[in-house]
A protein has these predicted regions:
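Fe-S-dependent hydro-lyases/dehydratases of central metabolism
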Residues: 1-268
């Protein structure tokens, strides 16, 4: 009869008990009553206020503030280097928003026109001006928008400055998800050639499909990977046209969008 194999692989007398005095760390119990004090004069730290909820219906009157041409990495969107000291202060680091982006309409870097004042300014400046006027704005971008390091601020800053939607020829996957986490709707052109049609100064008068998306209703031409959103656009000269765009929002991501951010959704 065969005998089971034997080997002296384990100590015959067992293991040494070890340090019996070890005490595991306490499990933390968050206390919302505790106040975290941040100096309001600090340039490095700022208490982050939750973003507001997403739309309950269609978007209307979205200003196309910028059409980006060519490569636009997360470093173009939110530069590192000396800006890193402001990572804890969203208002301050937002001054670098898209400061490396090339404007397809004027071939200038970080220069856009405020259609309400007629003056040119840095992208973050005009974004704040639009926000002060209650005018949501969007960016039209080229291929592989947001490639590079997975920089959360590249999405945070866009949302903070009042950009609820970005329309791209294509997105870098991680940045696309980061935008969704911050309540920004990333759309791609159904036909990438339609990028040529749009310009800064155009206005998306209304969307068609966002209301169904946030309500959880089946949309036009939905697929397991997403669905279709139509953009009804008006040029400055009054000419109108329609852009067919696509989204890739999952059920969970729609909830982030509806609540205003993934953090809002997690908080309930």
């Amino acid at each position: 009869m065969l005998q089971p194999p034997y080997g002296d692989n384990l100590p015959q007398n067992g293991f040494i008990p070890g340090n019996l005095s070890y005490t595991p760390p306490d499990i933390s119990h968050p206390n919302p009553a505790i106040q975290i004090n941040v100096d309001p004069k600090s340039t490095r730290l700022q208490v982050l206020e939750p973003f507001g909820p997403g739309p309950v219906g269609e978007f209307t009157d979205l200003q196309v503030m910028l059409k980006v041409k060519g490569k636009c990495t997360t470093d173009h969107i939110s530069a590192a280097g000396p800006w890193l000291k402001y990572k804890g202060h969203l208002e301050n680091i937002a001054h670098n928003t898209l400061n490396g982006a090339l404007n397809a309409d004027n071939d200038k870097v970080n220069v856009v026109k405020n259609v309400f004042s007629g003056k040119e300014g840095a992208i973050h400046e005009v974004g704040r001006e639009y926000q002060a006027l209650g005018k949501p704005w969007i960016v039209v971008t080229d291929h592989n928008y947001g490639e590079g390091s997975a920089r959360e601020h590249a999405a945070l800053q866009m949302r903070y400055l009042g950009c609820p939607l970005i329309l791209a020829r294509s997105f870098a996957r991680i940045h696309q998800t980061n935008l969704k986490k911050q309540g920004v709707l990333p759309l791609t052109f159904a036909d990438p050639a339609d990028w040529e049609k749009m310009h800064g100064g155009d206005v998306i008068e209304s969307t068609e499909g966002v209301a169904d998306l946030v309500a959880g209703r089946p949309g036009k031409n939905d697929t397991p990977e997403g669905g279709e959103i139509l953009l009804h656009v008006r040029r400055p000269d009054g000419e109108k046209y329609v852009i067919k765009a696509l989204h890739t929002m999952s059920k969970d991501q729609v909830e982030w969008f509806r609540k205003g951010s993934a953090l809002n959704a997690a908080r309930g």
